[in-house]
């Protein structure tokens, strides 16, 4: 391919609304152009990267035994009403009507459609297991689209759905997909981690996320450097930091703490370590009738409540922060001075594991301007319900017992779920077993953010000059940069010959035959992220030499013209082997 026959649209400046590196570089490199908030045109080079990503995904999904199909982007509301998600999903679900006033939606995911397909097409256990996948456009009406394609509204996604006879079959399908995903991201040349995750709104019993490691990642990943343990912050287990509870050494006392409504200020006033304080948070869970049920959640003063874990406290699935009226009724004190001692008997006290093992701790006194010191379980207040409700922090003991945890940032690019029978039972998706009895199909679902992978790869691989693509994702593998293509017949002939030979060898090469200054030409391809560059000019040809340079090399090499083809092929193959 020649640059004059392609479409290069590089820019010197990034758009003013670009917040992250990937957004800035994708626009400047001519990969995308914004058409509306969270919606982008993919220019030829951007689409080429997408196609390379799709090809890797298809190859590994097919190798894992999955079967490709294509489901509609527009889906009828009736299917989503069967599972209750039509009502449950918020404004992220883009609902539309046709000319007959019938309700439809633009799919954000396809569990309902694939389950409908399976219930109509699969009858017998002999047809199971089966795993369908598609690569399709999705739409989620994000309230605030940001970070370019990383959190856009329209995006491309690979979603797969497995159907099995039983849970044991699901576990096998899940493991097969986990291994396929691992191979997909390895082939893409990305540094990534698979982490334990919460299933969230999609439901099911177990899931793992795949994160590309990047300092700019939205998600915190808790991992153990000494083992394979990894989980996202929402799901990471937090063990007690004190294995046993110490003996009480202080008498409980009420002390004045005027205008001190947070643990840090209280600890400073009382000249105590922050780790000796306890934070009290009051939540309310509305009931079908009668007053809301109240919960007081306790975490150590230097820790943060994990809201996902809190939502799993029995009775707190649908909860909210208590109102001022509810706080006054339960504690007779304003927020900032709440504590578990002397609260209404109607309040359920839930202590984090670390708090449950604390002695002589400090907490709110349920009296404005006062806190309690020397508080001890069993003596000053009843034993609490003990659960893991906090966020993990650096230095926590690893849940697998193999050291302590660290925390890094990551960008979620894949997620695998064990859905179970949530959708099949809701939609009557059954098969006849060997005894002729109807059984619900056991489902798994597996997603990869195709377009999101582009942004994640750039967040991980870039420098001050532009994008540093893994070889398997790069829009081109090699660029040939002539010094005077139209002015020198020897240069033109050498460039054309090398281009044709590399094409014949299966190398993805582009010959930049534009009438551009060398500096501008080099800057464009460093911005775009071509992994390898060959420079051919009259000066080098006089000595039968050309320049060869890798994108991350500090200096170029002089290579004999007769050897450059093999040098390029060898370098490209070595780069591919490094990520295979």
From Swiss-Prot:
It is found in: Cytoplasm. GO terms for molecular function: aminoacyl-tRNA deacylase activity; ATP binding; proline-tRNA ligase activity. Its EC number is 6.1.1.15. The keyword Protein biosynthesis applies. Transmembrane segments: none annotated. Keywords: Aminoacyl-tRNA synthetase, ATP-binding, Cytoplasm, Ligase, Nucleotide-binding, Protein biosynthesis. GO terms for biological process: prolyl-tRNA aminoacylation. It catalyses: tRNA(Pro) + L-proline + ATP = L-prolyl-tRNA(Pro) + AMP + diphosphate. It is an enzyme of class 6 (ligase). Its main location: cytoplasm. It comes from the Bacteria. One of its GO terms (cellular component) is cytosol. InterPro entries: aa-tRNA-synt_IIb (IPR002314), aa-tRNA-synth_II (IPR006195), aa-tRNA-synth_II/BPL/LPL (IPR045864), Anticodon-bd (IPR004154), Anticodon-bd_dom_sf (IPR036621), Pro-tRNA-ligase_IIa (IPR002316), Pro-tRNA-synth_IIa_bac-type (IPR004500), Pro-tRNA-Synthase_IIa_type1 (IPR023717). Belongs to the class-II aminoacyl-tRNA synthetase family. ProS type 1 subfamily. Homodimer. Consists of three domains: the N-terminal catalytic domain, the editing domain and the C-terminal anticodon-binding domain. Catalyzes the attachment of proline to tRNA(Pro) in a two-step reaction: proline is first activated by ATP to form Pro-AMP and then transferred to the acceptor end of tRNA(Pro). As ProRS can inadvertently accommodate and process non-cognate amino acids such as alanine and cysteine, to avoid such errors it has two additional distinct editing activities against alanine. One activity is designated as 'pretransfer' editing and involves the tRNA(Pro)-independent hydrolysis of activated Ala-AMP. This is Proline--tRNA ligase. It comes from Polynucleobacter asymbioticus (strain DSM 18221 / CIP 109841 / QLW-P1DMWA-1) (Polynucleobacter necessarius subsp. asymbioticus). The lineage of its organism: Bacteria, Pseudomonadati, Pseudomonadota, Betaproteobacteria, Burkholderiales.
